[in-house]
Amino acid sequence: MKKIFTFDDFMVAFIAALGYGFGETIARLSGWPSVMCVAASIVLGIALEEFITKIVFSKAVQKSTMNRVFTYVAILLVFLAGQYVSIRWMGVSMLEYLQEEFAFVVGLPILGLIVNLLIRRYRIRKIRKRYGDGSEGFVFDVKKEDIEETNKRNQPIPGGYDADCAVKTRTGIFVGEKNKKTTSYFGIPYAKPPVGERRWKAPEPLPSSELVFEAKYFGASAIQVEHKGSIVKHYRQSEDCLTLNICVGGKKTESPKPVLVLFHHGDFTFGGSADPLLYGYNYPSKHPDMVFVSFNYRLGIFGFIDFSEIPGGKDCPDALNLGLLDQIAALEWIKENIGAFGGDPDRITVIGFESGATSILLLAACEKAKGLFQKAFIFNGSPTSVYNSPDASRALANDLLKATQTSTMEGLLQLETETLKDAAQGLWKNMCAPTCDGKLIPDDVYQAYHDGAASGIEFIIGITSNEAQVFRSLVGDQKYSDEIFSAVADMPNYLDDITADAVWAYLETQTASMGELEAKSKLFEQWLALCIYRLAIKLKEGGNPVHLMYWDEESLIENLGSGTVDVVAALLGNGDALQMYGSVMNADLSEALQTLLHKYISGNALQLYPNEIKGIDAFDWKAFPQALIVSDGKFRCNTIDDRNTEIKELLDYIKQ
């Protein structure tokens, strides 16, 4: 995507190299020791490079070609004049001096490029050695000390504390940790612990408090199904999981900072904010004028289940969508308290992937969540992945009774957490997503959008081209196969007869050439993409501003896929975590996506001016139906239905 060596890069490298050489040569001619000569070379070279870079890549200089040329000539003339005076003063001819500097001017830029390529090659080789062809899915080498650090628990602080790292909220004073670029607060409770008599009950607000607490360590992740490729299974889990994490950029601003709130992914059954892929340090470090928040919510049998038809189940009327109620409670806490952290409660952008994206879409249609966020970045999620009736959740409740050999709600409430967790592991196939109940979530989410339920919310919607392999890498081959066959078998429930016939005919032709599992995987992936595309249409028809993004990058290891994992890492700048997931981040692409996300959060136009990011041309992200297409490390804006992709093939098949 980024040009490896633009003319601007050449000018900066050329003048900086002259600076390195100038520092070394002057020091040597002055009789300084070798060590001092090297030090002088490095100091002058780095200082000059930083100074020249700020000038050359400033918005004013990049505004026109004439400005750029004038700037290059002026800088070069000033520097050469200074060098000439210095060299003549020391009695050395300019020709001798330039011969001395030749190695610096030519060699240093080339050496820097070679070193960067070697580092990248080493990282790729290390990943390939660990993952092989990727057929085993995600295999994490989690260090014991990292697990122990993540699993530490915050404690009350009875005595003195560091006031510089403390923030007073309505629910307590929280003492975080400060580093060079951010201050972080981890494991802050946003609701009463849903344990004991509050198990399977709606989240309750915390009382006001003046107590002081540590906020240095992540709270426990939700109790969850532990899949083969889930990293969160290595960390502490508990029913007491309703906590959030806040990272504040170090830049002081006159006005409150915009806020980015992350909803974690995991198919509503696994995942959590302790996943290194979702860490919030790097984004506010790069963009210090904003606040980043992530949080946990209840999952699986603790978050999405219907007890209404079992004895005593009427006492838990909200169990059907508890995970969504937790999310609303988190957003309410954020809106009430984020001002204490320097955030703006009226400029909240939510971002979610997979089930996190689906959650956001449901909350956008939910009256109870009205006004809790103003913008949404959703990737690979759709309201069509939720249930239209509570039948499946009621069946799950009955299965849970059988698995735990209980017969009443009272019996379930008395069970130990581990007993329920073990039962959930055996019931993973039957786990439920949220349900449109007509109470919290409208019966018809698309109609709600049409009627203006999501009015006032801007959307960026993302689609991936290779998400199925990512899912396989997370859950393992057997679970993946079971899930794909089940999902495709359920498709007729969402299709009219004509469309269903077209889909089955398409599937039959694909199966003949690639095998049943691969064909159904492709169909599932394509169908999800079409559902997301339809979502963009519905939101636009409802009057919402919509931008579309299509991720079509190839994965480093084909069998691991390229989708949510790569996008999350690129947007949040978590390159080290991405290596754990078997890939290497394209730093240029990540920088561009982070810049566009920051503009979106801040309310600026979604465009890049020339060389705003060094080596990247001007770019304008036009509104839907145009899409930002990310492919082969490059950006372009076009409609995705003009691409010769499998999505287009399926669309054409249905149209026929």
Residue ranges and their predicted role:
Residues 118, 125-310, 314-320, 583-593, ...:
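Non-catalytic accessory segments of hydrolases
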Residues 225, 530-656:
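Mobile gating loops/cap/lid regions near enzyme active sites that modulate substrate access
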Residues 230-232, 329, 336, 370, ...:
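Substrate-access "cap/lid" subdomains that shape
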Residues 265, 322-326, 354-357:
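Active-site loop->helix "elbow" adjoining a glycine-rich segment at hydrolase catalytic centers
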Residues 316-339:
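Alpha/beta-hydrolase active-site loop
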Residues 341-353:
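Alpha/beta-hydrolase fold nucleophile elbow
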Residues 352-355, 367, 380:
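Catalytic nucleophile serine of serine hydrolases
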Residues 357-369:
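Short glycine-enriched nucleophile-adjacent loop
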